[in-house]
Structure formats: structure tokens, C-alpha cells
Amino acid sequence: VLSNHILETHHVYVKESLPIISEFANKVAKVHGASNPENIEIAKLFHEVTMELQQHLMKEEGILFPHIINLAIAHRNNETISVPFGSVQNPIRMMEHEHDIAGDVFKKIEKLSNNFTPPAHACNTYKALYHHLKEFQDDLHIHIHLENNILFPKAIELEKE
């Protein structure tokens, strides 16, 4: 159930938000980059994290989450299943590492953007960019918390049982 919530809420949000924020970031970097060069770095960092998150979601949706669902079904039916990648802990460690990378990138973006605070002269696109970046980071924190602290430990526990 939690994996479905993460997929339907957080993964959908990420997929819908990435292109919107990317467009804002690129526009703000182009228009305001000369006077506010931090926006060029923000656009670059957001592009990097976009590429990483797209790959990350594909791995979770294509490999890890289906396996966790199969573990839960097998546990409920008192069955065992084969694990194609040794232990569920292997892909979980990889996902947690990728979560750390995304979190670190957003810490840099937060610092560069003065805690997502646009300058007084900011246009509406500039303000929207910082608003969306803050909103995205907030969702990412919840998303990572649900996976790292609830879903993944439960999957490891199910595999041991």
C-alpha cells in the first residue's frame, strides 16, 4: 500500500514537476544569469538532478517496487520467492545512496537561492522558480523519508521472515 502511495503521489509529482521547473530554471538563468549568476548554477544543478531522478524512478518502478510488492504477497501467502539481485538490501542501498545525492544537490540549490528567497527585483518567473524549487524539495524530503525510514526497512524485514 505504501509503495502505491509513493508511486501515485510522489513519483507522479516528480515526473510532472521536473519539466516545469526545468523550463523556469532555464528561462531565469538565460534572462537573469548575467546579473544573478547563481541562477546559471541552479539551472545546471537542477538539470543534473533531473537526469538522476528520472533514472532513479525507472529503477524503483521497474525493479525495486515490484519486488517489494512480490515480497509482501509471498509473505502474506507463506511463500518464498527468488531474488534476482541477491538481497533486497542491494538495490535499497543503491536507492538510499541516490537519495543522498539528490538531497545534497538540493542543499546546494537552497544555498545558492538564499533559502529559495528571490531578490526584490525578481519577475514572476523568477519567483515561480524559487517557489517550485522549495515545494519540490519539501516533497522530496517526504518521499525520501517514506522510502528510507518506512518502506525499505519493512522490505528488509519481509525478506528476512
Language-model-detected regions and their locations in the chain:
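Small-residue-biased structural context
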Residues: 1-161
